[in-house]
Regions:
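Membrane-interface interhelical linkers
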Residues: 1-11, 19-20, 24-30, 35-66, ...
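Hydrophobic core positions of alpha-helical segments in small-molecule transporters
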Residues: 8, 35, 66, 93, ...
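Juxtamembrane C-cap of transmembrane helices in multi-pass membrane transport proteins
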Residues: 15-27, 76-85, 93, 106-107, ...
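Juxtamembrane helix-start motifs in multi-pass secondary transporters
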Residues: 32-33, 174-175, 234
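Alpha-helical transmembrane segments of compact multi-pass small-molecule transporters, enriched
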Residues: 38-44, 93-106, 181-185, 218-222, ...
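Hydrophobic transmembrane alpha-helices of multi-pass small-molecule transport proteins
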Residues: 39, 100, 115-133, 260-277
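Hydrophobic alpha-helical transmembrane segments in multi-pass integral membrane proteins
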Residues: 44-54, 101-116, 154-172, 214-232, ...
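C-terminal transmembrane-helix exit sites in multi-pass transporters
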Residues: 78, 97-118, 128, 189-193, ...
Length: 278
């Protein structure tokens, strides 16, 4: 059940990040971040209140605050990468973020079984295959935005570690704390840089709202899952979000899916199945 929650979170992340990346091509990244994070904060706050989830106190939520800060920096890098590079390439590279949570699990003495290790290996191989773009002259190259995608991976790794630590007593309030931190940071940056948070067009607002709702929903699902299975396993399953992002980029934007990308996606999904079954 926990593995399914993590996979559902990956699906929500995939949709949310596609919406956020598409919106970032039409208005400033900071605008997308501030509004989407604000929408997500409002949504999860209402959910925490109506679910009668008791507030655990400030101190237990501090790791989630740190995680939220790392996460919004990761999202900023990801959306900027989407704006300057191909979504179908940038998204898979950013999925390297499970390395940090797996390392944290190792320090706790939590080691996946052999079947899960095999699945983790397949997921990573699939992600690498998705991340390589065939050059016209032959060979492979990393697309524009790859450096930003790597920064995004670092931010996402820090986010899931902080969220896991802050969700011990309440997953919902941990996400509230993380979202509050990300909204605060985005607004502060806007104030310091005198950046208007008004979108360039009202037509982009539905994309931004959808981004915030899907992204925050994913965070809640992943936070609940991390309370039931090791955070490293949750991270590996959550890292499958680029598969849906790539598919949406193909359907909506017409981005070409090479044979390597199709094989990479299939390998990653097979690996996720092994991780979940283990």
């Amino acid at each position: 059940m926990a593995a399914l929650l993590a996979l559902a979170g990956a699906a929500c992340w995939g949709v949310g990040d596609f919406c956020g990346g598409l919106a970032s091509r039409r208005t400033a990244v900071l605008v997308v971040l501030a509004i989407s994070q604000g929408v997500g904060l409002a949504g999860v706050l209402v959910w925490a209140l109506v679910s009668n989830d008791g507030f655990p106190g400030v101190v237990p939520l501090l790791p989630a605050v740190a995680g939220g800060t790392a996460g919004v920096l990761g999202l900023a890098a990801l959306y900027r990468g989407f704006a300057v590079g191909a979504i179908g390439i940038v998204a898979p590279i950013s999925a390297a973020w499970p390395i940090a949570p797996l390392a944290v699990d190792a320090t706790r003495g939590i080691v996946p079984n052999m079947l899960q290790w095999l699945g983790i290996g397949l997921v990573l191989v699939g992600v690498v295959a998705l991340s390589l773009e065939g050059a016209a002259a032959g060979g492979s190259r990393l697309s524009a935005g790859a450096g930003l995608a790597l920064l995004a991976a670092l931010g996402f790794g820090g986010f899931i570690i902080g969220l896991d630590a802050g969700a011990d007593e309440s997953a919902n309030w941990a996400v509230v704390a993380a979202r509050a931190a990300s909204v605060t940071l985005a607004v502060l940056v806007a104030l310091l840089t005198s950046t208007s948070l008004r979108p360039q067009s009202r037509r982009v607002l539905p994309l931004i709202v959808a981004c915030g709702l899907f992204d925050t929903g994913a965070n809640v699902l992943v936070a609940v899952a991390s309370n039931r299975i090791p955070v490293g396993v949750v991270a590996v399953l959550g890292a499958l979000y680029p598969v849906l992002t790539v598919v949406l980029a193909r359907i909506v934007l017409g981005e070409r899916l090479s044979r390597g990308k199709r094989v990479g996606g299939a390998v990653a999904l097979a690996g996720a199945a092994l991780v979940a079954s283990g």
